[in-house]
């Protein structure tokens, strides 16, 4: 208000000065053109000047922050389109809940106990007869009645003769068998700190972890200034990442080129079993609970049995996908963190 009033008073004085100059010019016999020229020169020399800003440092800081924010926002929108998309075959297909009920509806019937007690479950190791076996037997169901006299086709021997093995970590085999499906119960789930560290270090290998831009930046700072995929970043050593995230793999018989693909975050479906996620040959449950479903190829269902069993945090599974279709169904109330990969090199 003081500045505006000051400007008004200045212009009033200038107006009085111009009138006085005009009268004096007429009295001295000056032409109108000469008077206007003299007034113009007078106004140019006496133009009021605004005072400098009172807070120059604050204005500079404001401009720097605005420029930095604009640069970060531009970089985010430039880099985001280059982020790798989710692989289509994995975790992209959803089967109806009727398919799940079709394969496991016999589990609650008394006749299912008969099939589970005919040595088709988990084989005992030597010396295990005296100790109580953990309660994680797989559930076997027959889609079709098997004819023992009918010869087994060559492409069905893998699922007909190699049944799923479920074992503890100390019972893990020393030699890797490619055709033998197995679930190793390590009892070592991923901690929340390990998951957060993985999200910051390898954002390219994660999917489904919904988190705001600033929340993710604040959580990863200062360990990583910009926790998002860089298009110019070198290809990840996924074999090293697998053993870094799950050190137990250094003691397991999997090939050295076994690698991690992605880690997913899944919410349990409102209807249990309404969505089945297709998996590759290697998978690890980081946290949460799920149901594992193994389905043989259609042409082998007269000779092979479907398998369904619950799996827990820390469970490591391997299944040869040439003889089985592998599905995971999230269950329980806690979100499911599951990592998938492959036991063999892609080359």
Swiss-Prot record:
Main location: Golgi
Record key words, sorted: Cytoplasm, Glycoprotein, Golgi apparatus, Membrane, Signal-anchor, Transmembrane, Transmembrane helix
UniProt-listed GO biological process terms: chromatin remodeling; epithelial cell proliferation; positive regulation of cell cycle; wound healing
InterPro entries xref list: BRAP
Keyword Membrane: yes
Membrane protein topology class: Single-pass type II membrane protein
Cytoplasmic side: 1-58
Superkingdom assignment: Eukaryota
Residue ranges, Extracellular side: 80-347
Cellular compartment(s): Golgi apparatus membrane; Cytoplasm
Post-translational note: Glycosylated.
Entry annotated with the keyword Glycoprotein: yes
Membrane-spanning residues: 59-79
GO CC aspect terms: cytoplasm; Golgi membrane; midbody; nucleolus; plasma membrane
Role description: Exhibits histone deacetylase (HDAC) enhancer properties. May play a role in cell cycle progression and wound repair of bronchial epithelial cells.
Complex formation: Homodimer. Interacts with BRS3. Interacts (via N-terminus) with SIN3B.
This protein's name: Bombesin receptor-activated protein C6orf89 homolog
UniProt lineage: Eukaryota, Metazoa, Chordata, Craniata, Vertebrata
